[in-house]
C-alpha cells in the first residue's frame, strides 16, 4: 500500500531514471489508484521555496530536496515494494507550503 508523504525509490524512465520520490496523492485515492502523483527528490539543491530539504532523518543517504516544480504521475508498479522513509510533521507542513508555492495556490 502507498500513502501520502512516504518516500519510495521509483523508476521514472528517461531522462530522470531511478530516483527517490515523495508521494503527494491523498491517502483515500492512493489506495485505489493504479498511479500516484509524486514529487521527485534530487541532490541538486537550489534553495528555492518550491524545495523541501531532506536527509538521513527521512531515510535518505544524503542531503537532498523534494522538487515540487516537477511533480509527476507514476504507476504504482514503478515504485519499489516498500517505502524507504516518510515525512515527519514539520516536513509535511513544509511540503504543503512548497506545493502551494509551486502550483501558485494562494490561500
Where are these regions (language model features)?
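Generic anion/oxyanion-binding catalytic loop in active/binding sites
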Residues: 10, 27, 84
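Residue-level detector of alpha-helix boundaries and kinks
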Residues: 5-6, 53, 80, 84
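Short hydrophobic/aromatic-rich motifs at helix boundaries and adjacent loops
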Residues: 10, 22-23, 71
Amino acid at each position: 500500500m502507498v500513502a501520502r508523504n512516504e518516500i519510495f525509490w521509483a523508476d521514472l524512465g528517461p531522462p530522470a531514471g531511478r530516483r527517490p520520490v515523495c508521494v503527494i496523492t491523498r491517502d483515500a485515492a492512493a489506495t485505489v489508484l493504479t498511479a500516484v502523483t509524486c514529487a521527485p527528490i534530487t541532490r541538486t539543491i537550489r534553495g528555492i521555496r518550491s524545495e523541501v530539504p531532506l536527509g538521513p532523518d527521512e531515510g535518505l543517504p544524503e542531503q537532498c530536496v523534494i522538487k515540487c516544480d516537477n511533480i509527476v504521475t507514476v504507476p504504482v508498479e514503478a515504485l519499489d515494494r516498500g517505502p524507504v522513509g516518510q515525512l515527519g510533521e514539520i516536513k509535511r507542513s513544509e511540503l504543503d507550503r512548497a506545493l502551494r508555492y509551486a502550483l501558485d495556490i494562494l490561500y
